[in-house]
Amino acid sequence: MHFAKIALFTSISMFATAPVLAQAPQIEKNISMAMALAIIQGTIDQCTKDGYKVSVTIVDKGGNVAAQLRGDGTSPHTMEFSRLKAYTARIRNQTSLQTMKELEDPARAPLRQIPGLVGVGGGVPIKAGNGTIGGVGVSGAPGGEKDEACANAGIAKVEAALK
């Protein structure tokens, strides 16, 4: 009899809690291919106008490369460096220039242990509302501030879609 009560209680508990455990699928914003290409084009246009030859990388919400372009006449290292800058901006939810300034503080030294994190300007997070959905990394202009200005120009091309 005691076993029957336990079995009945267990069965009722399982059926009563099943609907509570069921949840709707999670829906997240992310970078589309069209958006990535528009950002790259806007970035390249600005840097070309300013006289810089750059490479540009767009990473998605997960930090994975969504699109990458090596500009004409750029050094080979600019592809990887632009990826690292984009990744840094994405995972830190701030510009890589801000990360560079943070790393100057000895108390923030443990940040240097994060694989793929770089403290050099040129990476800008792509934000949609309050969330970060990707990052842009630019490498090749003479200085991270100039790379960052080009990245901001690229993001401005898709600003309406990010609201």
Predicted segments with their positions:
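Bacterial N-terminal signal peptides that target proteins for export
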Residues: M1-L8
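N-terminal signal peptide c-region/cleavage motif recognized by signal peptidases
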Residues: A16-P19
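Flexible, solvent-exposed loop/hinge segments and secondary-structure transition points
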Residues: L21-K163
